[in-house]
């Protein structure tokens, strides 16, 4: 995610030296001002998690983050520092691919990726769902988000979506004014979720950094 910080991104694009690659990379960036469910879906597809899957199925896919990073490692005119950052990003994507494969082998789902923005700091996203319950019912979806917003500070959000479409949310905000803003906007959030036929059952806002606890003990 460090590579997708606005300052690093400008330096990165400036050293590409390839107008076509720069344009393609820019197309992968979302706008925080116009974010929507469709662009989140597109960001997941373009995250690099599914490139090998599409190739194995002989399915056409657009250039994704991982393919572009690999291309830059071979063709790009990058400084040694940026080359190391690009290599680290590829390693992270491949690590998340392995996590997803291991989850699928256990009848679970796990997608971990980063959404880059043109007008905001990147957002780290992790979707998870456990195996089906013993009674055949669906397990809850757990969605974790993390970003360090310039105007709101570090934020962590854990959302649990139940089979009955009820939602529980926990927000950790390091800045006290950001926590206050989140509490004040709870009614707006509830109304927005209703537009997607979702019910906000509980929202907990904590003025603190999210504790680092083993996800296997907490359900992420």
What do these predicted regions represent?
Residues 1-220:
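Extended non-catalytic alpha-helical interaction modules
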